[in-house]
Amino acid sequence: MDEAIQIVNAIKKGQISPIYFLYGEEAYFIDKISDYIAAKVLTEEEKGFNQMVLYGRDVTIEDIIGNAKRYPMMAERQVVIVKEAQHLSRTIENLCSYADNPQMSTVLVICYKYKKLDKRKKLHKIVKKNGVIFESKKLYENQVSDWLRKHLLSRGYSISHKAANLLVEYLGTDLSKISKELEKLKLALPQQTEITPEHIEEHIGISKDYNNF
């Protein structure tokens, strides 16, 4: 969680790496980092010729390397985002040759969800040396409640302990699912509101008396 914030903050400061390998069980942080790169690294004018999204089920590692080696057009950088890269798990180590000598004018983002990358293998070591490698781990229930409070606080809301527990009990630890439900609350309630079980029942439809036992 904190590491994801550090990665985004570094990008905000202009500290942009040539390769980001984002992997792990929690899709939420992978999406947040890749979406931030997609939104902020290039200007809207630059994106037309210099930003592309590839899907792991449709491409090979060689396709990815070929696109990453292109030069940007009328821009300092190009951005290549590979979504669903977990479909390339059998050949992912073939990325080593590129990761060892990445194109510095390319920002290559690999979104490798729901999979582990073996830390003992060459690719993990090379990306760690030349770029950013981030493991997005599932949060435990007690960590999700803490994340929920911080997430809302950063957006001008607070939440009662009972309401936070209600959301986690009902929705589990899937941060993407929780985030979507929080959007409903943010649309319905003004900032500075403390979210209560009654708000959750009214706007999300989870009974304030819900108990999964």
Spell out what each predicted region is:
Residues 1-213:
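Conserved beta/loop motifs at nucleotide-recognition and modification sites
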